[in-house]
């Protein structure tokens, strides 16, 4: 009888194996018809050239990382440094960055083989009453030490795509951490400008109180001289508590501004008690560039982070597609086993096992397609978020450019109004003192001057705030890394394929 060899078995079984493999491939889960629909928008397609053409903001570069130092207030510099060192929101951003980086490490580990070692000892004694004297009543044991090896071969790049997605997400988290610091700096500067405005209102109210007290004194003198009546005195007296109320309201605004700054630097309310009056902040000290929309892409941290998340979502699609293809897993086991621990080092005690395994998804109830469709939707969401960030950024820049330009002109006009109102008040007071003018003229001129001074203080505060907001809209001093710059430069309006 002719023995059946392995080669003859393989020769006769190969057609059947190939046919089965072909059938399995034809029946396996398919990603056909699934793809994302989002398309990245190009900044040039949003047409902001005419709006920003007349900005004339200067020839300086984008805001420096410490742009607020241009305002020349050491106390502001110290407050921002304190906030950057201790604010809880920054600790949260740093924690999210550590989470993202740990996910990079986990994804990297999934690409590498696993090796472990195990050892143990088992013993058994069977009862003599059941097995007799020859077998029962004796103790038998064995010890073993084994090395376990496993490796999932990344045939289709799915694991690498998952790792690359984690890397891109970590880049986004790093940009978010920078953005949190830049936003905190801008928020502290805006709150500081608000405190400066409160002090300006305090000055205006104090000046109004002094004018009211002076007018009351003069009116009493005129009544004593028989020129004015009690009516004029009562009118003058009513102006004093009104001015005192405005002074008290300004002081309340100062106190609230100090408390707000204390919170922004991550401290308790008592920290605000040590905040002195701010220096006069000059909005023109913040030198800003002539805006180039294309350069804005790499300077806005929210746009850069959104771009990284688009890239991460695209890599997740690649990883999801790889799950539709066969997977190969290698496992191996090698070690020693012996009935006596002392015999473990003998060559006769060694054993080994290797078992490659190929897995192919055929029917999973639509799980893989649902997973891929979900990743496609994630990509579309990331693209939509990026596009919205881009639109918002251009509108923020355009709005603040317009505000800076308009407020500068308004402040100049309002300064002229204050000068005119001050002169009119002085003239009305002189006429009243000389007895040729009425107290109503003084009241009217005084009210006009007060309102003009309050409006000027408000416009000057808005000037500083608009300059700060424009600095923030232009990136707030964000300094992109080389990877960030390359990612911004690679922008295209084609969707992930």
Protein language model features and the residues they cover:
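Terminal intrinsically disordered/low-complexity segments used for targeting and assembly
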Residues: 2-6, 14-85, 143, 167, ...
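Short flexible linkers and secondary-structure junctions
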Residues: 29-187, 328-332, 362-372
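Small/polar, glycine/serine/threonine/aspartate-rich low-complexity segments that form flexible
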Residues: 62-71, 120-148, 162, 271-289, ...
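Membrane-embedded beta-strand positions in outer-membrane beta-barrel channels/transporters
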Residues: 80, 144-148, 192, 237, ...
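Sec/SRP-type N-terminal targeting helices
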Residues: 91-92, 108, 153-181, 231, ...
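Periplasmic alpha-helical coiled-coil/stalk elements that build and connect Gram-negative outer-membrane
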Residues: 175-292, 403, 427-430, 448-450, ...
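A short glycine-centered flexible hinge/capping loop motif at secondary-structure junctions
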Residues: 223-227, 432-436, 473-477
């Amino acid at each position: 009888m002719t023995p059946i060899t392995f080669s003859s078995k393989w020769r006769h079984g190969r057609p059947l194996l190939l046919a089965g493999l072909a059938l399995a491939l034809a029946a396996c889960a398919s990603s056909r018809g699934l793809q994302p629909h989002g398309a990245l928008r190009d900044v040039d397609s949003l047409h902001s050239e005419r709006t920003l053409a007349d900005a004339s903001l200067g020839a300086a570069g984008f805001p420096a990382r410490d742009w607020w130092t241009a305002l020349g207030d050491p106390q502001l510099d110290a407050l921002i440094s304190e906030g950057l060192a201790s604010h809880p929101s920054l600790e949260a951003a740093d924690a999210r960055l550590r989470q993202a980086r740990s996910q990079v490490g986990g994804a990297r580990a999934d690409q590498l083989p696993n090796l472990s070692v195990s050892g143990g000892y088992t013993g058994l004694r069977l009862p003599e009453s059941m097995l007799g004297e020859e077998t029962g009543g004796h103790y038998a044991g064995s010890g073993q030490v084994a090395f376990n090896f496993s490796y999932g071969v990344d045939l289709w790049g799915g694991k690498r795509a998952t790792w690359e997605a984690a890397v891109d997400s970590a880049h986004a988290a790093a940009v978010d951490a920078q953005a949190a610091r830049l936003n905190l700096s801008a928020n502290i500067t805006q709150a500081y400008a608000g405190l400066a405005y409160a002090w300006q209102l305090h000055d205006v109210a104090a000046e109004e109180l002094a004018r009211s007290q002076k007018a009351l004194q003069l009116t009493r003198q005129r009544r004593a001289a028989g020129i004015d009546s009690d009516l004029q005195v009562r009118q003058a007296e009513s102006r004093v508590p009104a001015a005192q109320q405005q002074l008290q309201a300004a002081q309340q605004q100062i106190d609230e501004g100090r408390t707000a700054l204390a919170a922004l630097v991550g401290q308790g309310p008592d920290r605000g008690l040590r905040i002195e009056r701010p220096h006069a902040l000059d909005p023109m000290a913040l030198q800003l560039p002539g805006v180039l929309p294309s350069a804005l892409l790499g300077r806005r941290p929210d746009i850069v982070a959104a771009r990284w998340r688009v890239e991460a979502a695209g890599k997740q699609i690649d990883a999801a597609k790889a799950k539709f293809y066969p997977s190969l897993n290698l496992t191996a086991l090698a070690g020693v086993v012996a009935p006596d621990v002392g015999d473990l080092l003998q060559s006769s005690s060694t054993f080994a096992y290797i078992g490659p395994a190929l897995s192919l998804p055929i029917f999973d109830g639509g799980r893989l397609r649902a997973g891929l469709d979900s990743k496609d939707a994630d990509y579309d969401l990331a693209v939509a978020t990026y596009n919205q960030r881009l639109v918002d950024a251009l509108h923020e820049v355009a709005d603040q450019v317009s505000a800076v330009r308009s407020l500068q002109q308004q402040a100049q006009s309002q300064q002229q109004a204050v000068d005119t109102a001050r002169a009119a008040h002085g003239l009305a007071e002189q006429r009243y003192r000389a007895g040729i003018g009425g107290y109503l003229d003084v009241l009217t001129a005084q009210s006009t001057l007060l309102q003009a001074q309050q409006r000027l203080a408000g416009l000057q505060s808005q000037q500083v705030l608009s300059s700060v907001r424009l600095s923030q809209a232009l990136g707030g001093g964000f300094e992109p890394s080389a990877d960030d710059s390359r990612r911004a430069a690679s922008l295209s309006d084609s969707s992930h394929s």
